[in-house]
């Protein structure tokens, strides 16, 4: 019996020793990963995302310039048609050209208004949201990267707890990861990390003991990623709740499990409450104004499907009380010989072929309008032709006044001749009463009434005075009757 007891006691001691050894060595081999650093599989996608986000402000600047460039192209087209009309006031394509000029003017004004009130705001919103999210990511990654020293403190690791990520200028290990905001330059960019659906390359999950994003516990630790009161950053007392970092992407637990990464791959309305910064950057990205938007480009398709052109026809060419069905389409078809989209090409080609000679607006060589694209130069050319047109109006007005003066002078002389032809025949003179004739009993001859003669002479002098002063503010009705083509020119 004694021998048996001794053996049992010895066996018990051996088991106790073995158990102690297992307990002592267990943390180094199988303890949960709640206090180790963040694996590269988790932080590298964040680096890719923050690198992409750093380019959004430059991308928005580039998109804004593209929008303005598109509007300028439409403005250039408006200038060209206006120049053609100013240069060719008697063109047979007056209505078609005027309609096209009005279309381009509406598109230009509408595009500027749309960009001023809506488009620009969407681009600024996207740049702002991207910068805010990038700041949240950069701040925490920078903190994790900085928390290292010796063999124990490592918060950004590669694949195991003891190998910290190494910074080489703008890279962490082999991954571009500049935690700063670069200079804003207008550049196009490709979106791969923040797409129309969300953040497809970000990891998600964790929250257990499977070492998904934090490696097995070893010498290297990162207590910042654990809210456990024994193994994490709290002292003695447990935390009331879990901690949210990275703008809601990561949850640091207050139990002995690893951190949890939220699913940001497919964004939706639910993220607006749980991760507002991520939701805002995603939503803003999908609402950015782009140069290809209809507000900033020419309309396409059949003429009767182009809203701007139809609205212009209704305003300019149809009676206000028109109730005819498809009246706009009927008018467009009559003007352009059909409704196909290319029916305006004939008139636009005619405008582009118009030659602007050397000497106009400082040009040293002649060129067709189709080869001139700068809006400043086109504006100068239009101003030049408008000045020529204004001078032509002054010259024509003077010529018309001279003709009127001559006609009035001849009228007075002719009337006086008619009266004088009656000579001393009083009865014949009385028959010319309606012509302004009166019989002078003293001189015994038929004469033009004194007041009629004075009136005609006065009108003649007034006309002569206006001609000398080059007065260009005379009756428009006079010009309308005398120069209908000039009036048409002035209207355009």
Curated annotation (Swiss-Prot):
UniProt keyword annotations, A-Z: Cell membrane, Disulfide bond, Glycoprotein, GPI-anchor, Lipoprotein, Membrane, Signal, Trypanosomiasis
Gene3D superfamilies assigned to the protein according to its UniProt record, in alphabetical order: Variant Surface Glycoprotein, subunit A domain 1 (3.90.150.10), Variant Surface Glycoprotein, subunit A, domain 2 (1.10.470.10)
Example of a GO biological process term: symbiont-mediated evasion of host immune response
Signal peptide: 1-32
Domain of life: Eukaryota
Cystine connections: 47-177, 155-222
Residues linked to a glycan: 298, 471
Localization, UniProt: Cell membrane
Residues making up the propeptide: 476-492
GPI-anchor amidated serine: lipidated positions: 475
One GO term describing the cellular component: side of membrane
Main location: membrane
Membrane topology: Lipid-anchor; GPI-anchor
Function: VSG forms a coat on the surface of the parasite. The trypanosome evades the immune response of the host by expressing a series of antigenically distinct VSGs from an estimated 1000 VSG genes.
Protein name, UniProt field: Variant surface glycoprotein MITAT 1.1
Source organism (scientific name): Trypanosoma brucei brucei
